[in-house]
C-alpha cells in the first residue's frame, strides 16, 4: 500500500481530518460511488495499519468486493476514486478557510449573471471587511486586487463615481502584491539556499529596486502596510545579520499583536526569526539562545510546531538541546512528551532516545544517558555529531578515558569529510572536539596545564558547549587556586 497515492494522502492528513472526511464521502454532492464508501469504512476500521501502509491490496479488495476474483484494474480505480475525493476535500478545506476568495468568487458570479443589486450589496460588504483586515499579506493584496478589478469591470450607476479612486487603489494593491510576492519568495528560498539573499540583489528581477522603494518609503509602508514592513525587516536582517535592532522590532510587533496574526503569517515570521536567531547563536552571540527558546515556546503555544502531522527530527532535537543549554529541563521534558510521537517513523526511535539522553545528561544521570545513546542511529550529520558530543561528555563524567579516544578519532575523521551542515555549525563542532581533546589530555596526564586551558577557553569567542568545557577545566584548576 505504501507505493500508492492514497497512502501518501492518508499520511498527510490528521486523524481529525480523516474522521471529518467521512461526511464528505457520504455526501451525494461529492460522491455517488458506494465502493469508495466501503473502502473508507475498511480504512477506518484498520486505521493504524493503514497509516503504517501494512494493508495488502488483496485485503482491501476482499472487504469491498467480497469473494470476487482480484482485479488489478478495478483495485486501482477504487483507490484512485478515494484519492480524488481526498484531493477535493483538501481543496474544499482551503476554500472554506479563505473567506475573501469565496466572496470574490460570488461577486464574479453576480457580475456574470448581471444582478447589480446583489453585486453592489456584496461589494460593500467585501470593502468593509478589507478595511478592517489586520493580516495584509500576500493573499490579501491578491484578493483585494481581484476585488477592484471586478468593480472596475462592472460599471453601474452605483459605482461609476468611484472609478478613478478604485483604479488608483487597484494599481497600488498590484504594486504591494508584486512586492510581497518578490520579498516573500526571496525570504523563503534563502532559508534553504545559503547565500541566496545576497545573490538575489543581482539576479532577481526588480528585487534591488523593491528594496530601494521600501527604504525610501519606509515610514509610509510602516504605517499603511505593516505586514509588508515586517517582511521588509526580515529581508534586512538576512542581508545584514548585524542589524539586530530590526529583529527586536519584529519581535516587539509580534508581542504586541500576537493574537491578531493569521496562522500562516505568524508561522512565516517565526520561522524567519528562528533562522536568524540560530545563525546568530552559532556564530558566537550567546544571548540569542534565549531568543531561540522564546521562539520555540511561541511556536508551541500557537500550535505551529508541527509541519502537517509531523515534526522534523533535526528540529525536534535542536529544541531539546537549546532548552537544555538554558537549563529549561522541565520544558524540554514536556516538549519530548508532547511531540515525540509526531516524529517521522524513520526518526522516531533515534530522535526520542537522543533527546532523552540529552535530558538525562543534564540531570547527571549518565548511565541512563548512555543507555539512550546506544539506541540512536546516525541518521544525518547533525544527529551524528550531536550523538558524538553527548557520548564524549558522558564518558568524561564517568572517567571512561579509553572510550573517549575511540570517539574522538571517529569524529575527527568524520569532520574531514564533506558534510552538509553550515560552515558555522561545523566550526562549533570542530572547536568542541579540539578543546575536548585538550581537556582529556589535561585531566589524564597534564593536570598542571589546567589553568592555562581555562584561560584559553575564557578568551575564546562563544561557541556551543563552551560553558561545559569551561566548567570542567575550572574543576581541574581549582586545586591550583585558579
Where are the language model's segments positioned?
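Amphipathic alpha-helical repeat scaffolds
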Residues: 7-10, 107, 317-321, 354, ...
